[in-house]
């Protein structure tokens, strides 16, 4: 009998006993559990658990739609509350339909492509379970339909970013018309470049764990374009350049929206681990949850302190945006950093969102909820912050193959193991130094002169710890490139 399966079934029996099942009934349940367990393989159980985890994570991300709705309704004027709520509920339905009809097949096409092929309407046939039953090393570890559900709520998230930025200025039907284009074409195409096996992921090794760039920066870029087109709200900016604050009508509602988003982000980042049925995957999910929570906390306090220093008092809206900025910042890689580094990444995000909001006001770019700053400015920081704990994210620079987690593998995920955090921490400074110096030296004739010195800096006194060995290899590859210069 499979011991793993038996453990789960015995746990269920124990739970039943706790709720008043008699000893005789419990014995019958144990016998039934043993009979069921004898016919279930570990692969089947892992498949069921990973699929269930995927679906629950997707449900958490869907709940973020409520968070965006509450946040935006709280930060706009009361006369526009119904309109902003209507936009949010309608955009979610629009995103689901467009991603079903076009978007999903656009996003997941042939590897290495710049433009996707055209294959309309998602097929409801799911042969993943058959493959699991057949066994083999390439057996998937979750249902492909659960993957669609998880991805479609990401699309709705990207479009929700746009709705807040253009609040109080864009008519409903014009907004929904853009939502059709955004969710059916724009988001899937740029998502295909990376997550869908396109050129960014396959050729350049671009790393974005849960979508700081793919989801949040995409939504912010679209929001910025629309905000520039529709212009600021009437009365927002005076003729002499002064900024006239337009406070939100319901800050308690905005705070509720922040906490809903904070909660949903655990599914957003945690679900992007793609599996939970193995020990490694379960530990990774726990690490992602902790780092996500710490980054949000760091971002909130950083923005709150910045407001205190700048305005002389605490500002709730800045604190809310600081928490969201911390979440966006850690989304690109919530797995690799330590909890302390994740907090620091969130702190930088909180500072950046404060500065960005004030800077956009100077440019007379009116963003009622701070969406462009939270998801755009901090989204860029999140993508760059990947290098702080994961040097492999830039392996394409010197031609090294990038280690990545496969789209589908066995339940144990044996093909993908994270680098120990201690090795990552020790090698971060050396790797960053070699990358930056190598990029510069490759382009100048003096590279041959400074190449050997670069190698010595990266490999001080011949010490060959694991991170230094990796860094020395990078330096050697850079030097070989330098020697090819004319």
Positions of the model-derived regions?
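Positively charged N-terminal leader segments that act as targeting/secretion signals
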Residues: 431-467, 471
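Short, intrinsically disordered C-terminal tails of secreted or membrane-associated proteins
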Residues: 480-485
């Amino acid at each position: 009998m499979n011991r793993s399966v038996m453990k789960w079934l015995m746990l269920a029996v124990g739970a039943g006993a706790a709720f008043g099942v008699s000893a005789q009934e419990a014995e019958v349940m144990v016998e039934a559990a043993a009979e069921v367990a004898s016919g279930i393989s570990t692969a089947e159980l892992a498949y069921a658990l990973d699929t269930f985890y995927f679906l629950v994570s997707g449900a958490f991300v869907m709940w973020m739609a409520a968070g965006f709705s509450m946040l935006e309704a709280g930060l706009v004027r009361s006369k526009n509350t119904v309109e902003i709520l209507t936009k949010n509920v309608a955009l979610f339905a629009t995103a689901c339909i467009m991603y079903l009809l076009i978007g999903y097949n656009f996003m997941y096409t042939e590897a290495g492509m710049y433009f996707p092929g055209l294959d309309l309407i998602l097929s409801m046939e799911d042969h993943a379970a058959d493959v699991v039953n057949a066994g083999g090393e390439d057996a998937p570890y979750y249902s492909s339909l659960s993957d669609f559900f998880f991805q479609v709520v990401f699309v709705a998230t990207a479009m929700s970013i746009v709705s807040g930025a253009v609040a109080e200025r864009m008519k409903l039907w014009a907004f929904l018309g853009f939502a059709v284009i955004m969710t059916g074409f724009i988001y899937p195409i740029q998502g295909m470049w990376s997550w869908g096996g396109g050129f960014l992921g396959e050729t350049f090794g671009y790393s974005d764990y849960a979508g700081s760039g793919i989801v949040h920066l995409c939504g912010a870029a679209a929001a910025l374009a629309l905000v520039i087109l529709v212009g600021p709200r009437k009365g927002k900016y005076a003729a002499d350049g002064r900024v006239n604050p337009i406070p939100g009508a319901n800050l308690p509602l905005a705070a509720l929206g922040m906490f809903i988003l904070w909660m949903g982000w655990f599914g957003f980042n945690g679900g992007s681990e793609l599996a939970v049925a193995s020990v490694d995957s379960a530990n990774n999910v726990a690490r992602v949850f902790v780092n996500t929570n710490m980054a949000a906390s760091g971002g909130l306090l950083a923005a709150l302190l910045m407001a205190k220093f700048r305005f002389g008092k605490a500002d709730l809206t800045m604190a809310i945006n600081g928490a969201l900025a911390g979440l966006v910042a850690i989304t690109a890689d919530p797995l690799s950093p330590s909890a302390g580094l994740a907090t620091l990444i969130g702190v930088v995000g909180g500072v950046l969102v404060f500065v960005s909001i004030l800077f956009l006001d100077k440019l007379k770019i009116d963003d009622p909820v701070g969406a462009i700053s939270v998801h755009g400015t901090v989204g860029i920081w999140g993508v760059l912050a990947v290098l702080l704990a994961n040097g492999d994210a830039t392996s394409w620079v010197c031609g090294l193959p990038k280690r990545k987690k496969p789209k589908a593998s066995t339940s144990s995920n044996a093909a993908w193991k994270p680098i120990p955090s201690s090795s990552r921490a020790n090698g971060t400074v050396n790797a960053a130094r070699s990358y930056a110096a190598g990029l510069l030296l490759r382009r100048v004739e003096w590279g041959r002169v400074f190449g050997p010195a670069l190698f010595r800096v990266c490999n001080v006194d011949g010490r060959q710890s694991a991170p230094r060995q990796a860094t020395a290899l990078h330096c050697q590859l850079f030097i070989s490139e330098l020697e090819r210069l004319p």
